[in-house]
Amino acid sequence: MSLWKVMKLGLIHSAFWTTIQLSVSNMMLRCPTSVFVKYETFFKIWSWEKRGALWNKLFRINKWKHYIPEAAQFNYRIYNKRRLASFKLEDIHFMILEMRRAELVHWLSMIPIVIFIKAPKYILFINVCYVISAKLPIILTQRYNRPRLEHYYQLRMKRDERTCRKRKSSL
């Protein structure tokens, strides 16, 4: 295969995956956050994940996660997940929902790999490698960060409940 053909294929596939990512991302931005509350079981953190610690132990996520670009840099409508707006319960909950959205976007953007099943093996191999290397680190980062934030959120909720009960009982 000529260099020209390889470059042309690379350009076409880059455009394809960029279009897929942007389309899925924009489609999911239109999805109300209430969906991520209603279907929270789809985003359940399993006990064997040990609140995300498993992913950090296996892949040392805390060493490289800061290299992942924040999507909000490219699309102003995307919530910036680098920092919490504040430590208010509503902001923490909103961040958790946006992390669920980010995870789902990356899972959904992997689905089009099926298009390449009938393609020559080297094309399929290259695209599978791309999907795994581009999407899986982000999914794993969400699976590492979100359980920790959810745990913090639950602790804050319990603490706030106790504080409210103490205030009511002292009245």
UniProtKB/Swiss-Prot annotation:
GO cellular component, as recorded: plasma membrane
Gene Ontology MF terms in the entry: acyltransferase activity
Regions that span the bilayer: 125-144
Asked whether the keyword Acyltransferase is assigned, the reply is yes
Q: Which InterPro entries match?
A: CrtO (IPR044021)
Swiss-Prot/TrEMBL keywords: Acyltransferase, Carotenoid biosynthesis, Cell membrane, Membrane, Signal, Transferase, Transmembrane, Transmembrane helix
Q: In which pathway does it act?
A: Carotenoid biosynthesis; staphyloxanthin biosynthesis; staphyloxanthin from farnesyl diphosphate: step 5/5
Which family does the record claim for this protein?
Answer: Belongs to the acyltransferase CrtO family.
* Protein name (record): Glycosyl-4,4'-diaponeurosporenoate acyltransferase
Organism per entry: Staphylococcus haemolyticus (strain JCSC1435)
Q: Which gene encodes it?
A: crtO
